[in-house]
Amino acid sequence: MSEIERGVAAHGDVRGSGWRSELQRASRVMVAARWPVLAVAFLLFAAIAAVFGGWLAPFDPNRQNLVLRLADPMTSGPDGGVFLLGSDALGRDVFSRLLYGARVSLTVGFAAITVGGTIGITAGLLSGYFGGWLDDLIMRLGDIQLAFPFILLAIMFLVVLGSGVWNLIIVLGIGQWVTYARIVRADTLSLREKEFVEAARAMGDSTFSIIFRTILPNILAPLTVIASFNVASVILSEAALSFLGLGVPPEVPTWGSMLAESRDTLVANKWWLAVFPGVAIMLTVLSFNILGDWLRDFLDPRLRERT
């Protein structure tokens, strides 16, 4: 089969039922492997907590009760409720803040990857397809950004822009675009002279159609793997910036800010203030890394037999 036929067949699979069989095969392979199933189960649990946290939380996450400050886990709270995971230094329910923190952390993670991926994929496609001065410009901009430690750049931008969820998303997204741009550029360089791309040109397809409808679908698999790893990286970065007081506003609960607030109480043996948000961050990052590792093996034909 020629490259043109393979390209046409690939497009047919995408538009037809091929994706259904791939999804079914992925489900069978994932069920056979325990760790990816556990990772997906935890991420689904975190997503449910993020979406329905407002209904699941027993208390307002910002409601203060100084009489019950630093209460132990399972302590009776106001209105007949229970502080399942204890309360913090201001008497706020840790469990409620943990649920609301999942919403912020996951939203920032996925939104930042969407911003960074959109910028990086577009830049990589244009750079690899057109080459020349545009390629040099985009790659040099990426080199300049990589010359600075990302956390330092993030701190500089957030000091100028101020705290806020959207400012944090933009800063973290900009920090991710170079990775996508370089990978997409390399794949575009290898695909732009292939027979199925030449066939699209011969049929009169526009440049936009060739780039985004012919080349892009053929490079999405590795980007899916990278995105799963990068979500974990962004969540860690958000937690670090919130820990430094440069993330979202103080009244918005996040896992990183909860860790920051626990610093002064660790010496008083109030372990739950650091342990629960720390474990939430650890399990979320670990789950995304396990999922990304499994996706890499599943989508790579050379490694598929191992999954």
Ranges and model annotations:
Residues 1-41, 290-307:
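Transmembrane alpha-helical segments of polytopic membrane transport and secretion proteins
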Residues 2-4, 41, 49-87, 244-253:
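Hydrophobic alpha-helical transmembrane segments of membrane transport/permease proteins
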Residues 7-26, 80-95, 127, 208-212, ...:
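Short, membrane-interfacial amphipathic segments enriched in basic
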Residues 34-44, 90-307:
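Alpha-helical transmembrane segments of integral membrane proteins
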Residues 37-54, 113, 121:
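Short, strongly hydrophobic transmembrane alpha-helices
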Residues 47, 51-58, 73, 222, ...:
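Phosphate/oxyanion-binding loops and surfaces in catalytic or ligand/nucleic-acid-binding neighborhoods
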